[in-house]
């Protein structure tokens, strides 16, 4: 089983002072990749890319308004799609190439055995489970990854005047990282600002090294830096990141 991004954490309350790190540090690229069919485009022209489909089978309790989750997914997947020639991403309601879900430690054995695990994913491997991603919903997901007052999360455990802060995790950063694995990238240890760096760094945009690696697998889309920056800033502005 190809599991990634097992996060070390000894505090079940996920104290904001604990450093999180990803444990699988291989840097070679995976031997398999997505090869979706390139169907006809408008007016019968041949598209030079294919769609990798995805769906969310179980949503996060931290985003009761699914629009936040939808935006996070769109930002993460579109950033990869803007940089690749061969693939785009499309959300579906039925059978999908990549299935994403949120589960807590009561529902997922790995999260019970390793309570500090933030998420795990499978490489594309030609099998049904290839590309699937599971996020630990026992941790606190937010739009910005900043510490949050404990009373806001656990009003039954903390008093309104508590000064206790709990660590939260940026949903877009984690989606970007896990989606990188789901489309074939392993960790990068050389550049600490990379999305695929093996330590959680909260970055919400692709580093040039991330781009070079994914384009070595799926080709370069060829959009100008100005256009890419425009779409990226527009997406992040709507998200609030």
What is each residue range found by the language model?
Residues 1-241:
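Zinc-dependent metalloendopeptidases
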């Amino acid at each position: 089983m190809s599991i990634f991004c097992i996060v070390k954490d000894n505090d079940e309350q996920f104290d904001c002072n604990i450093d999180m790190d990803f444990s699988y540090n291989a840097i070679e690229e995976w031997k398999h990749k997505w090869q979706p069919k390139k169907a006809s485009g408008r007016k019968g022209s041949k598209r030079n890319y294919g769609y990798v489909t995805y769906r969310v089978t179980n949503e996060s309790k931290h985003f009761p308004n699914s629009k936040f989750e939808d935006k996070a997914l769109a930002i993460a997947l579109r950033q990869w799609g803007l940089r690749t020639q061969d693939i785009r991403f499309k959300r579906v309601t039925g059978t999908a190439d990549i299935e994403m879900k949120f589960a807590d430690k009561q529902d997922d054995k790995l999260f019970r055995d390793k309570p500090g695990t933030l998420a795990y994913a499978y490489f594309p491997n030609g099998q049904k489970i290839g590309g699937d991603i599971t996020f630990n919903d026992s941790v606190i997901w937010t739009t910005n990854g900043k510490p949050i007052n404990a009373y806001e999360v656990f009003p039954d455990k903390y008093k309104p005047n508590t000064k206790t802060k709990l660590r939260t995790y940026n949903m877009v950063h984690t989606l970007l990282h896990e989606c990188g694995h789901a489309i074939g990238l392993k960790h990068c240890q050389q550049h600490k600002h990379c999305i695929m760096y093996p330590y959680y760094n909260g970055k919400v945009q692709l580093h040039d090294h991330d781009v070079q690696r994914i384009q070595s697998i799926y080709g370069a889309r060829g959009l100008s830096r100005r256009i890419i920056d425009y779409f990226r800033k527009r997406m992040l502005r709507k998200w609030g990141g």
